[in-house]
Amino acid sequence: MKIKKIKLLKALALTGAFGIVATVPVIVYSCSSTDNNGGTGDNNTGGGGSGTDQQQGTTYTPAIKSDVTLSGALSKIYDTTNTGDSRKNTNTLIAEDIKANPENYFTNGEDLKKVEGWSVTVDGSFDSNSVWTGDAYSKWSAVADTHKGVYKSTSKQLNINSLKDLKSQLDTSAKIKAICDESNLVFSTADADSYKIQNELGFTGGDLLHINVTATQAGKTLNMDLGIPVSDLNLKITDLKVSVTASNNSTGNNVAAVSDLTTNFTYNIGIKEEVTAPTEKPNLAKTDKGEVMKVLKALGYTQTGDETKLDNDKVSNSLGLYNCEFTAVSATPVEGSEDKFTIKLKAKPLTDYVWEDGTNTEKEISFEATFTMTGN
């Protein structure tokens, strides 16, 4: 009996040991972080990123990064496709990007990305009431003798938190005149105190914002079309609010609900790579058709006083490819044509600028141009 009793006790001990092992779930730890904003990301504190023991998995508490700096296409923050009531607002677009790329926003984003069933809302305090009122771009830009200029590539980028903020930054004649002067809209005899912002914004080519500016010169009204490439704009939002609705998966992992996490959000709008081929037919001597710089000079792309170098702004304004440094590659006659050439250039974003894909490497662009051939 004593031997049987000892065997029974050993059996109970072994059963108890394996019983403990069997009831402990496999814990998938979320990323820890020293950045605590609505969640610490420390599994030992019960904060962001901690695992709540479930039989089926882990619940992750989203832990937002204190600063989020991104770059990319304008379409990530402004709906360039839809119009009217179907147009998505900036809050919705940022929320969609957070859901698709949580690793860019949360310290434990890689874990959150593997979980289904949770959703995101964003509050950037964007003013829904437009302050750009008056005539539409199609009307004011058609006024006779409208002077056009584009913000120079050497000018500084503009940090805004909304289009309303952009207008508020141009709240004096002095500020408006200064930005016009930087855009080749210089009128030495215009009344410096008469510069005003008028009418609605325009938007063309998917990458150029148009502002209507008026000023008084010799008793008459000057009408100006000030173009600002969207790649000159950085969206900067202090304390962007992010809230997450919990998932409710019966098996596997889950994401916990959190409200009003805040981050400092900066978005550098990238350069659109598409080019618009020139439509004018400038004169080109037949003897110059084999020399790329002379072909580019005929297009008006070279610097004043130095025809061996390209003028970045002249090239940009012609092709609609802004804030790049350009170098010539080739100008090759199109086969079977006497007056049409394929032009190839290399374009590299200037310092602090990027392409829509977030890179700033040099890329080759090409387009066709037609000339009026002269000489024998």
From Swiss-Prot:
Keywords: Cell membrane, Lipoprotein, Membrane, Palmitate, Signal
Lipidation (N-palmitoyl cysteine): 31
Main location: membrane
Signal peptide per UniProt: 1-30
Subcellular location: Cell membrane
GO CC entries: plasma membrane
Membrane topology listed for this record: Lipid-anchor
Lipidation (S-diacylglycerol cysteine): 31
Pfam families xrefs: MpPF1
PROSITE patterns linked: PROKAR_LIPOPROTEIN
Chain intervals with Gly residues compositional bias: 38-51
Span list, region Disordered: 35-59
Presence of keyword Cytoplasm: no
Family: Belongs to the p35 lipoprotein family.
Listed name of the protein: Lipoprotein p33
